[in-house]
């Protein structure tokens, strides 16, 4: 099950390269660990458990063949009575009575034997199951911890080449596969093997001739079973592969749903999903055909072997070589032995799967990183001055060894100095910072602190003296205080408050309802960019680091936050050695040294003035920025600073910034939901009334011809079993009732022939039954998955905001619901019909032949059935509970793995390990409990079988002596009822599946029938031929549906004429991005209206409306496909030509970069575009928006993530793109919007000021103060 590989080899057919790779990997044999290595984590107690469990399993396995010995002797007793009474017609009543009394006495003894075996089984079956489960639970607990420790111990370079999603899968799926393979399944395997050997030994000792004849057909049976298993597992593999690819598409699409909706990509994504489903369906149908041909063939062979065995056996009895009891003992012993091999095969398969999974898991556990963050070795200097030096550093990333990043870097930083690194995107600035933390080691050269090579310093110690603030700060899904505590384990609340004040975050935190105990949400999604950044700064400050690394720490902030955060950083730098990376050069003017990077080396160094005189790289970058940046404050600039400070800055971070359902920037492309597979169980099991059986069948109604044929065959199959019982008892009756040898010979020939006919019928009916239901089931699964996905893509954005509908929850639902519905319709339905027919026919026949014994058996059967149901119930209940509890640990693991860089920089690996270990405690205790529960229920169901034999044959003997029944009829009733009951037991084991199916069906029906308020698929609404591009908001009131109590827009009115550029400014969280989302019609306003060319947008066709808009957001989401496909995604209504893609790339100034890549436009961008830098992603996103040729352009902070040079060219590209288009721009960097036709200042959800740059400066209001703050920062 190369699920991981599939997730990596993401979803699209056209990526033939990927396809080839996975095919090649498929062919190679999967590596597995040796049998003994599987148990490398077993302690002495586990070994004892396994040893005793194995002995118990062997004893349990021998019980069944032993019972057959008794059964044979018992048949002989009956036969002798039958023969005597037949042959001696003149027997006196007294003799008869004496004979029957002797028979009853013998039967009582046999009943005691049966009971004794049952009592033994009760004990050993419990030991067998519970001991193996205990041993497995204990080992898995260790493996989980070791594995998580190993992941936390790897170096960053290792993570670059391993897929994060894959590690999560390994941690959940692979470890549970090991669990499956090393627990009670091994006990069951030994039990089956003991039965096999026991059966054959008894067979050979009691009658070797007959054993050899039966064995002649066994290899054929075994071989066919083996081939069947092989074919089936290869189809299952391929089918899972196809489903995994479909799942990967769904996950990617749902994680980027806002991007998909904005660009109208629903149809394209549905097709992509459907192609993978089509493949899975095709394989599923093939699987159904092969599986059922083999199934039919197996039944044919089994019946043929019965025919042969009974024909030969009866010959031996007639020639007086064997007794009839001997024939039955040999026949059943060998048969049970042979079947036990078949029963062992799923256990062998589970063990083989476990070995394969263990190979991957142990490989990671054994992988020793070259940079070991847990290592105790290395120097820990008492006193660090903070003199840093990079000496002739050469470096390339492990994931792209061919691209050299640093080519001989030399740089010295003196203690207490601030050094700024400047240069273009991708020139190696961030790499330098990463080498300083020893996230990687250089290929050549040396990094040193105070003259000491950092490779000789203890890794953990080194990272603890460094504080890092990066461009996109990662917060963990816990409280604000906890997040800051990640900076330093033993920090006090006072220190946290002090750090927060220094980072200028205190005010906004105190305004939150729970203050420091406010949960920040997944990845900090509940806070705005500026708020997150300041918490990250506080987190770095509590470490009181000797060395501070600031990688673009203020780029994501709005003006006002930026000024205060910048002040906080300036304060933080005092007395510390600091390395700063900044695209915004105004923030690094006061650095002691500015180092200009170009092509992986430093080409110039000096302070601002020196470098300006040199007129090199730095000078160029500064000129580029200031050309657009000199904010004309005119004479106003000389206003005293105090006056600016006194201006109304009430817009600080008004509490409203908390609205961010997920920070406004993320809103266009919600972050990749990190709970991935770990969907909250509540989300999946919310209370929906289960759908009725008929409702489920209705979903499958178009396949009714298949069902008619299938049900007809199923009923015939059901009748075959009782027919077998009748023939079997007649064969035995031929001998127990006595009679001349010729008649016996004729009768036994006839009955043997009937066995063969049964086989031929079953071959045809089994194949047809399985195939028809299987095909109908596959068609249904595909149809449901497609309908559900289609319906999900139809929903509006507010539906995706609902915490119940995270990406993880939805992908899980897509994968599980359809499969579970199939569980209640497909082949399961066939088996239910078949088994009901089986028991029904069985009971009718039994009542005719012996109603007294039938009633006794019908009283016992429910007890066995109830025991079976209880066992199923307990196990499925436990499984649910397990899953729910492991979800908690899964969430911790996912968070740690996805944000591993942050965990490493903060040296918090051990903290996550402790949290993970704690979260495993409850599942571990449950596993221990479950071992006993499972052991008790299992042993009870097993032992009941022996007890019921005792009761049945003892009572049967009584009925025979009373001459109410013959032995032949006792056998008939017994086998008809017991086989029927076993069949019903099989049905009852489907009950949990059926229950799941009804819940899943109701989920599906609910989603399919849900029509959203804003329906992307609707054909209704106007589609004007002409669009000018006049936009008007009139008295718009809006709150996000997930936070109805927090007002966002409170009566907002604004207007932008065609071709104009409107700029929205305001502090974080004031509702700027919301304006863009309302225009895209992601949401509808609660009051007021939005107009386009004078028409209310609610009257326009949704798809048409979005096709007129092109959007570029701050953190663009790219899909895991080629650059060309990502750009072409801009217009999904047609096939975008290669020329257009190139033209758009040139306009967005990214063509040159793409052209320099080995695969050019076919280069894959990686999951969420991870293979590209921020600036490169942004430009591809701009090209994507331009391909649309939109009438209205929406730019939400489109340049904030870029370095100076990219920004300048991208800004030019955007200016060019704006020509003749209506444009709405959101920007924190005010210099980029000076030339806007209209600037609107939003505060608390209303327009506070509007006008041109000059008009607003003259008003000396909020805008003026924001500009002054930014200009002040520049001047300083």
Swiss-Prot record:
Residues 50-353, 707-996 form the ABC transmembrane type-1 domain. Residues 1-43, 134-182, 233-290, 349-707, 774-828, 871-930, 992-1276 are cytoplasmic. Residues 67-112, 205-211, 313-326, 729-752, 850, 954-969 are extracellular. Residues 388-624, 1031-1269 form the ABC transporter domain. It is a multi-pass membrane protein. It catalyses: ATP + H2O + xenobioticSide 1 = ADP + phosphate + xenobioticSide 2; ATP + H2O + phospholipidSide 1 = ADP + phosphate + phospholipidSide 2; a 1,2-diacyl-sn-glycero-3-phosphoethanolamine(in) + ATP + H2O = a 1,2-diacyl-sn-glycero-3-phosphoethanolamine(out) + ADP + phosphate + H(+); a 1,2-diacyl-sn-glycero-3-phosphocholine(out) + ATP + H2O = a 1,2-diacyl-sn-glycero-3-phosphocholine(in) + ADP + phosphate + H(+). Translocase activity is inhibited by verapamil and is sensitive to energy depletion. C1orf115 regulates drug efflux through modulation of ABCB1 localization and activity. Belongs to the ABC transporter superfamily. ABCB family. Multidrug resistance exporter (TC 3.A.1.201) subfamily. Translocates drugs and phospholipids across the membrane. Catalyzes the flop of phospholipids from the cytoplasmic to the exoplasmic leaflet of the apical membrane. Participates mainly to the flop of phosphatidylcholine, phosphatidylethanolamine, beta-D-glucosylceramides and sphingomyelins. Energy-dependent efflux pump responsible for decreased drug accumulation in multidrug-resistant cells. Interacts with PSMB5. This is ATP-dependent translocase ABCB1. It comes from Mus musculus. The gene is Abcb1a.
């Amino acid at each position: 099950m190369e699920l991981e590989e599939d997730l990596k080899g993401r979803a699209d057919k056209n990526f033939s390269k990927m396809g080839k790779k996975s095919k090649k990997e498929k062919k190679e044999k999967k590596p597995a660990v040796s049998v003994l290595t599987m148990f490398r984590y077993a302690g002495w107690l586990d070994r004892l458990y396994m040893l005793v469990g194995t002995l118990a399993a062997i004893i349990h396995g021998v019980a069944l063949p032993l019972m057959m010995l008794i059964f044979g002797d018992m048949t002989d007793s009956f036969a002798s009575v039958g023969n005597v009474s037949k042959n001696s017609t003149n027997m006196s009543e007294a003799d008869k009575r004496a004979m029957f009394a002797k028979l009853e006495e013998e039967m009582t003894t046999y009943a005691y034997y049966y009971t004794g075996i049952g009592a033994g089984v009760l004990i050993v079956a419990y030991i067998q199951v519970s001991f193996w489960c205990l041993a497995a639970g204990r080992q898995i607990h260790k493996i989980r911890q070791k594995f998580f420790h190993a992941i936390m111990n790897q170096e960053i370079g290792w993570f670059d080449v391993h897929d994060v999603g894959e590690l999560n899968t390994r941690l959940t799926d692979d470890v549970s596969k090991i669990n499956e393979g090393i627990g009670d399944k091994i006990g069951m395997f030994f039990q089956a093997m003991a039965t096999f050997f026991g059966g054959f030994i008894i067979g050979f000792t009691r009658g070797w001739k007959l054993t050899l004849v039966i064995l002649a057909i066994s290899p054929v049976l075994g071989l066919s079973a083996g081939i069947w298993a092989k074919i089936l597992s290869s189809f299952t593999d391929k089918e899972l592969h196809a489903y995994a690819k479909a799942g990967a598409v769904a996950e990617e699409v749902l994680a980027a749903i806002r991007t998909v909706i904005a660009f109208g990509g629903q149809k394209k994504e549905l097709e992509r999903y459907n192609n993978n489903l089509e493949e899975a369906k095709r394989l599923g149908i093939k699987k159904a055909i092969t599986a059922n041909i083999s199934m039919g063939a197996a039944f044919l062979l089994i019946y043929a072997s019965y025919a042969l065995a009974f024909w030969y056996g009866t010959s031996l009895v007639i020639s007086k070589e064997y007794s009839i009891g001997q024939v039955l003992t040999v026949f059943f012993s060998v048969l049970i032995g042979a079947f036990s091999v078949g029963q062992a095969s799923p256990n062998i398969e589970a063990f083989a799967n476990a070995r394969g999974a263990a190979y991957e898991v142990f490989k990671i556990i054994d992988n020793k990183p070259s940079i070991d963050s847990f290592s105790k070795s290395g120097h820990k200097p008492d006193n660090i001055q903070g003199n840093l030096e990079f000496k002739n550093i050469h470096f390339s990333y492990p994931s792209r060894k061919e691209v050299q990043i640093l080519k001989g870097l030399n740089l010295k930083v003196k203690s207490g100095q601030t050094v700024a690194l400047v240069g273009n995107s991708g020139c190696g600035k961030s790499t330098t910072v990463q080498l300083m933390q020893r996230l990687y080691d250089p290929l050549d050269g040396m990094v040193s602190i105070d003259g000491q090579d950092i490779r000789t310093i203890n890794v953990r110690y080194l990272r603890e003296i460094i504080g890092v603030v990066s461009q996109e700060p990662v917060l963990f899904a816990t409280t604000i205080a906890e997040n800051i505590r990640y900076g330093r384990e033993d920090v006090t609340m006072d220190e946290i408050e002090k750090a927060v004040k220094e980072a200028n975050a205190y005010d906004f935190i105190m305004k939150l309802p729970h203050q420091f105990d406010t949960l920040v949400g997944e990845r900090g999604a509940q806070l705005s960019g500026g708020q997150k950044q300041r918490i990250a700064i506080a987190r770095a400050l509590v470490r009181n680091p000797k060395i501070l690394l600031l990688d673009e720490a203020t780029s994501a902030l709005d003006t006002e936050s930026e000024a205060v955060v910048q002040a906080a950083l300036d304060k933080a730098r005092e007395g510390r050695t600091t390395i700063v990376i900044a695209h915004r050069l105004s923030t690094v003017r006061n650095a002691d040294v500015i180092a200009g990077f170009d092509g992986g080396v430093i080409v110039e160094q000096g302070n601002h003035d020196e470098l300006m005189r040199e007129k090199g790289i730095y000078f160029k970058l500064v000129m580029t920025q200031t050309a657009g940046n000199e904010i004309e404050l005119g004479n106003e600039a000389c206003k005293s600073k105090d006056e600016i400070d006194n201006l109304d800055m009430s817009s600080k971070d008004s509490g409203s910034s908390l609205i961010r359902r997920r920070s406004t920037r993320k809103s266009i492309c919600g972050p990749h939901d990190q709970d991935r597979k770990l969907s909250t169980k509540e989300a999946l099991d919310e209370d929906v009334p289960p759908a009725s059986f008929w409702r489920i069948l209705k979903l499958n109604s178009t396949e009714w011809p298949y069902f008619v044929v299938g049900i007809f065959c199923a009923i015939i199959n059901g009748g075959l079993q009782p027919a077998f019982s009748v023939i079997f008892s007649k064969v035995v009756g031929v001998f127990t009732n006595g009679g001349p040898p010729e008649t016996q010979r004729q009768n036994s020939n006839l009955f043997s022939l009937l066995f063969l006919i049964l086989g031929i019928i079953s071959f045809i009916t089994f194949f047809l039954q399985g195939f028809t239901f299987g095909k109908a089931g596959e068609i249904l699964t595909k149809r449901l998955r497609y309908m559900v996905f289609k319906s999900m893509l139809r929903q509006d954005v507010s539906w995706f905001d609902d915490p119940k509908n995270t990406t993880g929850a939805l992908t899980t639902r897509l994968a599980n619901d359809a499969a579970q519905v199939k569980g209640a319709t497909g082949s399961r339905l066939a088996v239910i019909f078949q088994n009901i027919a089986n028991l029904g026919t069985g009971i009718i026949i039994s009542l005719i032949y012996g109603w007294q014994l039938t009633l006794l058996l019908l009283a016992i059967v429910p007890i066995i059935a109830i025991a079976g149901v209880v066992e199923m119930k307990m196990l499925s209940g436990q499984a649910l509970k397990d899953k729910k509890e492991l979800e908690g640990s899964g969430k911790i693991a996912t968070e740690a793995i996805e944000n591993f860089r942050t965990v490493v920089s903060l040296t918090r690996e051990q903290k996550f390990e402790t949290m993970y270990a704690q979260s495993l405690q409850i599942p571990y205790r449950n596993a221990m409990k479950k071992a006993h529960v499972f052991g008790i229920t299992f042993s009870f169901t097993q032992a009941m079988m022996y007890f019921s034999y005792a009761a049945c044959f003892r009572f049967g003997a009584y009925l025979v002596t009373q001459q109410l029944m013959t032995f032949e009829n006792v056998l008939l009733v017994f086998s008809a009822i017991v086989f029927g009951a076993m069949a019903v037991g099989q049905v009852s084991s489907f009950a949990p599946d059926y229950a799941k199916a009804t819940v899943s069906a109701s989920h599906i029906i609910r989603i399919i029938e849900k029509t959203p308020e804003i329906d992307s698929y609707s054909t209704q609404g106007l589609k004007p031929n002409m669009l000018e591009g006049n936009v008007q908001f009139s008295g718009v009131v809006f709150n996000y549906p997930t936070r109805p109590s927090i007002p966002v827009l409170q009566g907002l009115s604004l207007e932008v004429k065609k071709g104009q550029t409107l700029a929205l400014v305001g502090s974080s969280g004031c509702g700027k991005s919301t304006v863009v989302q309302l225009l895209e019609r992601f949401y509808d306003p609660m009051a007021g209206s939005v107009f386009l060319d004078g028409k209310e947008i609610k009257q326009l066709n949704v798809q048409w409306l979005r096709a007129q808009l092109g959007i570029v957001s701050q953190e663009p989401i790219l899909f895991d496909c080629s650059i060309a496909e990502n750009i072409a995604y801009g217009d999904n209504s047609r096939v975008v030509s290669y020329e257009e893609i190139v033209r758009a790339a040139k306009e967005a100034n990214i063509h040159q970069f793409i052209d320099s890549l080995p695969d050019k436009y076919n280069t894959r961008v990686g999951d969420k575009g991870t293979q590209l830098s921020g600036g490169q992603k942004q430009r591809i996103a701009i090209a994507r928006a331009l391909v649309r040729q939109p009438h209205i352009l929406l730019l939400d902070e489109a340049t904030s993530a870029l370095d100076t040079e990219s920004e300048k060219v991208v800004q030019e590209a955007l200016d060019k793109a704006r020509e003749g288009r209506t444009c709405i721009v959101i920007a924190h960097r005010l210099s980029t919007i000076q030339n806007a036709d209209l600037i609107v200042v939003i505060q608390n959800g209303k327009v506070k000021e509007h006008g041109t740059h000059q008009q607003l400066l003259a008003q000396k209001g909020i805008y003026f103060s924001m500009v002054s703050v930014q200009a002040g920062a520049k001047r300083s």
